[in-house]
């Protein structure tokens, strides 16, 4: 769609070489969940630009409060999760589960926050997999390599970002 086209132009204009492997691993139909490591703010944009499936994401509540991001979240049927509010989190899990059952894809970062250690991953939050188990859908693991370099404050040097869609794990 239009958002995807804009994202692809931004990537090209932003001096980013996006190397993508495994697009054939993205299910062509029915809903699924993508679980990716989280290195930086650019992660969602890289995945959204490369994945043709209608996709939403589960965001931390603080991002949903930023006006421009809020509009994009609404347009993509993304949901904000308040990690301090268990009842609200359960509601989001139920909403995502229903959307996945209707054929939509959702992206979750199971680390819950960005790793500040380059390509090193943080521990996963166990609850982040509830959407996949409740919706009984395939899980597509996504590996991002060097995306932390993209919005680095050091300037506008060319960056090569690797994005790997791994084989789906069936329910």
Which residues make up each language-model segment?
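A cross-family acyltransferase "interaction/gating" segment
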Residues: 68-71, 101-107, 116-171
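Catalytic core of membrane glycerolipid acyltransferases/transacylases, capturing the structured
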Residues: 1-5, 11-14, 28-86
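Short glycine-rich anion-binding loops that position phosphate/pyrophosphate groups of nucleotides
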Residues: 38-40, 111-115
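Short gly/ser/thr-rich secondary-structure transition/capping motifs
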Residues: 13-21, 89-90, 145-147
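Short acidic-hydrophobic, aromatic-tinged amphipathic segments that line or gate anion-handling sites
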Residues: 20, 79-82, 171
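Anionic-ligand binding region
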Residues: 88-97
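Generic preference for hydrophobic
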Residues: 20, 34, 57-58, 163-165
């Amino acid at each position: 769609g239009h958002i995807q086209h804009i994202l692809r132009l931004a990537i090209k204009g932003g001096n980013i070489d996006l190397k993508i492997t495994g697009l054939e691993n993205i299910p062509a139909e029915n809903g699924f969940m993508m679980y990716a490591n989280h290195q930086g703010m650019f992660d969602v944009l890289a995945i959204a630009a490369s994945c043709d499936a209608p996709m939403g994401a589960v965001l931390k509540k603080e991002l949903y409060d930023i006006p421009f991001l809020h509009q994009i979240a609404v347009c993509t049927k993304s949901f904000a999760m308040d990690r301090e509010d268990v009842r609200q989190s359960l509601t989001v899990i139920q909403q995502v589960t229903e959307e996945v059952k209707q054929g939509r894809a959702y992206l979750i970062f199971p680390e819950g926050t960005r790793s500040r250690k380059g390509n090193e991953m943080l521990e996963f939050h166990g609850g982040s997999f509830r959407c996949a188990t409740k919706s009984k859908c395939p899980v597509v693991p996504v590996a991002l390599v060097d995306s932390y370099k993209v919005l680095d404050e050091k300037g506008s040097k060319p960056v090569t970002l690797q994005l790997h869609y791994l084989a789906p794990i069936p329910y």
